[in-house]
Amino acid sequence: MLYICNKRRLFMSNYLFTSESVSEGHPDKVADQISDAILDAILEQDPQARVACETLVTTGMALIAGEITTSAWVDMPEVVRNTIKEIGYNSSEMGFDWQSCAVMTTIDKQSPDIAQGVNEGAGIDLDQGAGDQGLMFGYASNETDVLMPMPITLAHRLTRRQAQVRKSSILPWLRPDAKSQVTIEYENKIPKRIDAVVLSTQHDESISYNDLKEAVMEEIIKPTLPADMIDANTKFFINPTGRFVIGGPVGDCGLTGRKIIVDTYGGKALHGGGAFSGKDPSKVDRSSAYYGRYVAKNLVAAGIASELQIQVAYAIGIAQPVSINVNSFGTGRISDAAIKELILGNFDLRPKAIVQQLDLLRPIYRQTAAYGHFGRSDVEFPWERTDKIEELKSAAGL
């Protein structure tokens, strides 16, 4: 009997996996939201605009730079200030606020050498080509109802809840900057329990550390995390330095595109390195990553695999991908090669087709720029649709 128990244990695989999220008031996320707010303002007037907008935020200043080709006119300082105001930096006591911060802009046009590879009817490939070379990943897993990894899903819920209780004045001493981190214990690839939770939230001077810890536990952590995943051994770290008054762009310089793992799958899937925010959908860094999620999510929702990762790579100016790779991590009901054929037969991976299928030439990007681009339950994104399930089941013979 002892031998049998030991043998069973030998084949069981327990491990920990951790993902983090940051709030909308985190300096890098402030930058992302400003870049995407500018993108939305331009797309509202000119859906065919080419936008690559980068933002830097620091004490008392926001700097906007990049390459933009458009017929639209946008009051960028106004967009920047409104975004900062909506996030919640509304007092000079924070060292960064929407009324007094300086807004500087330095914008050029898109390079014509790049444009001829992207414009339909121009360049060597007359179809609309990829805006750059690169590799993008899409991923889905059935371990949560939104078909996302559990660690990043719960981490995002914590930072969203922090913003809710701050903006509704349930905890009026909270400030916009916050970070969360969730560690899940897996057994044979199945989430079993929450092993550790870290939540650091900016606050004003009025709250004591003990009162803050109690309030964060009762108003943010307990209402957010599933009680059946928490046990006596779950560890909680609430503002573990003891103080977090200085935060936001005063505490750290923020830049667009520095939270690419927070934006995607929390490290559970691979990442090609390209950021999303501030880029119009002709940039495959963004549109192909969204489409990769759409492909993977539909395949998992169809029951073809319980976990799936797809890699797609492009050459600048060329419409068709140069490579496609599929990994079902041994969970596929058909082979990875067969899944690849399903993808090629049921999804069009050319940049123009992606934009058309997902209807991406719309001002929908500001809302992607905090709390993750994938697996959202608070907003509806076209790449989260599961409208290919029956088609894929039929094609797979399931």
Swiss-Prot record:
Positions annotated to bind L-methionine: 67, 110, 252, 283
Cofactor remark: Binds 2 divalent ions per subunit. Binds 1 potassium ion per subunit.
Biological process annotations from GO: one-carbon metabolic process; S-adenosylmethionine biosynthetic process
Catalytic reaction list: L-methionine + ATP + H2O = S-adenosyl-L-methionine + phosphate + diphosphate
Keywords: ATP-binding, Cytoplasm, Magnesium, Metal-binding, Nucleotide-binding, One-carbon metabolism, Potassium, Transferase
Location(s), subcellular: Cytoplasm
Any one annotated GO CC term: cytoplasm
Entry cofactors: Mg(2+); K(+)
Superkingdom field: Bacteria
Listed GO MF terms: ATP binding; magnesium ion binding; methionine adenosyltransferase activity
Function: Catalyzes the formation of S-adenosylmethionine (AdoMet) from methionine and ATP. The overall synthetic reaction is composed of two sequential steps, AdoMet formation and the subsequent tripolyphosphate hydrolysis which occurs prior to release of AdoMet from the enzyme.
SUBUNIT field: Homotetramer; dimer of dimers.
Protein known as: S-adenosylmethionine synthase
Encoding gene (name): metK
